[in-house]
């Protein structure tokens, strides 16, 4: 069976891995998944990520914990294949009053909601992380 929404699968694997206190989670790799993992690392939500170049590339995300609790409290898919959500530069959401981040796909690539606001760009809201 084919996977309908690989980004939602990635977010679910991270959510489930942290709920089960796993050190890392593995998933099939894709450029968009690697870009999301890079943003999550830059924002401090995951410890690290690595791409294993084999016959089938695999992305391994090393999860991050603080005092035994997962750093990621919520990770939620917003725009999905059946219902795309686009926001203009003035409509970009603030997650948890600015404590979390929204990952936005813009014409300049993936960036956080803060970076998109500074660049004066809107785009497709991929997910919320807090």
UniProtKB/Swiss-Prot annotation:
<dbReference type="GO" id="GO:0006412">
    <property type="term" value="P:translation"/>
</dbReference>
<dbReference type="GO" id="GO:0003735">
    <property type="term" value="F:structural constituent of ribosome"/>
</dbReference>
<dbReference type="Pfam" id="PF00410">
    <property type="entry name" value="Ribosomal_S8"/>
</dbReference>
<dbReference type="GO" id="GO:1990904">
    <property type="term" value="C:ribonucleoprotein complex"/>
</dbReference>
<dbReference type="InterPro" id="IPR047863">
    <property type="entry name" value="Ribosomal_uS8_CS"/>
</dbReference>
<comment type="subunit">
    <text>Part of the 30S ribosomal subunit. Contacts proteins S5 and S12.</text>
</comment>
<keyword id="KW-0687">Ribonucleoprotein</keyword>
<keyword id="KW-0699">rRNA-binding</keyword>
<dbReference type="InterPro" id="IPR035987">
    <property type="entry name" value="Ribosomal_uS8_sf"/>
</dbReference>
<keyword id="KW-0689">Ribosomal protein</keyword>
<dbReference type="GO" id="GO:0005840">
    <property type="term" value="C:ribosome"/>
</dbReference>
<comment type="similarity">
    <text>Belongs to the universal ribosomal protein uS8 family.</text>
</comment>
<keyword id="KW-0694">RNA-binding</keyword>
<comment type="function">
    <text>One of the primary rRNA binding proteins, it binds directly to 16S rRNA central domain where it helps coordinate assembly of the platform of the 30S subunit.</text>
</comment>
<dbReference type="GO" id="GO:0019843">
    <property type="term" value="F:rRNA binding"/>
</dbReference>
<protein>
    <recommendedName>
        <fullName>Small ribosomal subunit protein uS8</fullName>
    </recommendedName>
</protein>
<dbReference type="InterPro" id="IPR000630">
    <property type="entry name" value="Ribosomal_uS8"/>
</dbReference>
